[in-house]
Every structure is written in structure tokens, then in C-alpha cells.
């Protein structure tokens, strides 16, 4: 089971005397931010970072094909120890969503967090505040490996998700879904801001479309 499902986008562009792999040779993997939009520039479907190490281009005269790969940054989390949004160590008890938001913030992407996970504690209200990640707390010691040292952010997310839910990026937001709700045709989700604060409850948009023989796309 894979609870963290990273995504990447591959872009191909023609090179010229002014544009080639040399434009990126001095960059790092979190220097060039990539946004993929459909229709209009504001209709962003994917946000990530250009993976400089994955650039590909044949060393032949222009024009040539330059292949650029953008990743969502989730792989970066394997090398970053858990701290809160401000960069300080967690102490005492904190909401589960605060750990999730702090870990995802280390990707460098301030994206909203969509949670479709409708298991609730028996006394929780039927409101965004009652979402399990917002209502339930975990002690910071849950993720402490030794005194003053914590799991990396990737491991923290794996522990929280377990085999119950998965995390990916969908339509320019982090998306957490409970596996047993995958076939739910009337799903309810809670949107959190990138820092873990509650935004709203909404009925999640279904990813399906009916296409007739005379329909135009």
C-alpha cells in the first residue's frame, strides 16, 4: 500500500539559441516553480518544482527537444525533520491537521489541504471543526525518535495516513482521501488552509464527465 502518491508533470519544449538546457544548469531542485494551467492562467491544475537533475536534451544543433520534469515536492520531505510551520519543534499535544500542514509546508508549496475523511469521534460536531484531523490531537512524542529529534516529514505523513487514507495533489491542492470512501458518490470534504486552519466544508467535485456522440470538448 502506498499512502503518499507523488505526482510529476513532463513538459517538452523546442530549444533555440536563447532557450536550452543551459538556462537551468546552475539551478537547484526547488528554485524554479512550475504551474500548469488549463484554459486560463488562473485555472491552475498542478504546482510543483522543476527537477533540474531530470532535465534531458540531445546535444545537437537547435531546434531540439528539451524535456523538463516538474515534481510536487513530496520527495523532498524524506530529508527534512518535522518542525511546526514556524520552524520550531512541536511540543505537547497538537491537532493532527497541524502535523500534516507543517509537513506539507516543507515542500515549499502553500496549497490548500482537501480532506475527504468522514470518520468522526462520537462527540464531534457535524461541522469542519468536527473533522477527525481537526478534532483529535496527538502528542509530539508520537514522532520523536530520540530526545529533541523527530521523524522526517515523509515518515510523519506515512504514520498519520497508515493504510486508511492516501495523499496526493489534485487540482492545485493537497488531497487526502479515506480509501473506504473512494466509491462514495456523495462525498463531503473539509478544506483547510496551508497552515492547517479550517476554511470550509464542501461537496467534493466528482471527476467524471458524460460525453455524447455530438458533444464538443
Residue ranges and their predicted role:
Residues 56-215:
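Charged- and aromatic-enriched interaction segments used to assemble
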Residues 1-92:
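Beta-strand-rich assembly/attachment modules of structural machines
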Amino acid at each position: 500500500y502506498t499512502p503518499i502518491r507523488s505526482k510529476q508533470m513532463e513538459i517538452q519544449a523546442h530549444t533555440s539559441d536563447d532557450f536550452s538546457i543551459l538556462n537551468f544548469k546552475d539551478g537547484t531542485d526547488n528554485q524554479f516553480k512550475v504551474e500548469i494551467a488549463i484554459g486560463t492562467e488562473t485555472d491552475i491544475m498542478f504546482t510543483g518544482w522543476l527537477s533540474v537533475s531530470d532535465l534531458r536534451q540531445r546535444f545537437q544543433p537547435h531546434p531540439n527537444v528539451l524535456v523538463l520534469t516538474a515534481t510536487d515536492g513530496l520527495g523532498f520531505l524524506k530529508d527534512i525533520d518535522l518542525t511546526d510551520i514556524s520552524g520550531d519543534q512541536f511540543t505537547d499535544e497538537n491537532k493532527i491537521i497541524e502535523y500534516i500542514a507543517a509537513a506539507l509546508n516543507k515542500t515549499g508549496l502553500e496549497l490548500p489541504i482537501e480532506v475527504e475523511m468522514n470518520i468522526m469521534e462520537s462527540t464531534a460536531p457535524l461541522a469542519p471543526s468536527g473533522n477527525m484531523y481537526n478534532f483529535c490531537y496527538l502528542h509530539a512524542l508520537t514522532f520523536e525518535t530520540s530526545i529533541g529529534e523527530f521523524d522526517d516529514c515523509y515518515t510523519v505523513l506515512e504514520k498519520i495516513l497508515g493504510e486508511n487514507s492516501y495523499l496526493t495533489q489534485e487540482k492545485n491542492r493537497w488531497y487526502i482521501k479515506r480509501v473506504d470512501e473512494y466509491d462514495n458518490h456523495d462525498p463531503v470534504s473539509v478544506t483547510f488552509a496551508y497552515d492547517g486552519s479550517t476554511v470550509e466544508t464542501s461537496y467534493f467535485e466528482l471527476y467524471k464527465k458524460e460525453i455524447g456522440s455530438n458533444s464538443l470538448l
